[in-house]
């Protein structure tokens, strides 16, 4: 019991850490201008390979990646199809995350990430048969109230919001169901995604010349790869260590950070109505935090 609580606590800390890094990643599309969102996505995938390998080799080694391919996935066509569908899913989400801030879809993406945890929690209950505690139900109801207000206030639902909240949960839940190791899984994902990205970069002569001529890209692009590698591996690892319901509520940290970045960095104005969206979500996070403290005391 004590070991299980230790793993859950570690998963919660990893999830919070990864959500904070996702907030930083959102800024890279702005810092790397005049590169387009698609350019930033392609460079992110290529530089992330090196970041992931820097984590992989000193910790679990290259054999673990080979073991994923030969043993975990093996000769099962079903598992390979499910894995590759997840890879396509992840690739589309990575592209959308970098493309949205520069194409007027920032608010819609934030809405998608607000709905994402709710869909995760419902699917975790329906697909993985995870039970929700009373406190977790209260937290999810609070979060749902905030999201419902935002939907009522904006009265819009774009394709970008729909793509994030309905498609992205499949990636996390399928990997958890298949018991794919987090670091090895995301490394194989990025290797596969980087192949078309490499072809794309080679076809963009203007982008290549810009990156080679401006020294700031020599620092920003490696930083993009390292931050991406750490955030994604930590996030996927945490999703496998904690119940989906807790992971769902903690996932609200990212859209809240995106909101704060929009207000304090991008100078977007906050209205009184916005508080009716964000205060219930903040309260849901506090409720989950209280449950974690209570469970820790019970173990002691």
From Swiss-Prot:
Q: Which InterPro entries match?
A: EamA_dom, RarD
Transmembrane helix recorded as keyword: yes
Q: Where do the TM regions start and end?
A: 13-35, 45-67, 80-102, 106-128, 180-202, 217-236, 243-265, 275-294
Q: Which UniProt keywords apply?
A: Cell membrane, Membrane, Transmembrane, Transmembrane helix, Transport
Major subcellular site:
membrane
Q: Which SUPFAM superfamilies does this entry report, sorted A to Z?
A: Multidrug resistance efflux transporter EmrE (SSF103481)
Query: Which subcellular locations apply to this protein?
Result: Cell membrane
Q: Name one GO cellular component term.
A: plasma membrane
- Stated family: Belongs to the EamA transporter family.
Q: Which named protein is this? A: Uncharacterized transporter HI_0223
Which organism is this protein's natural source? Haemophilus influenzae (strain ATCC 51907 / DSM 11121 / KW20 / Rd)
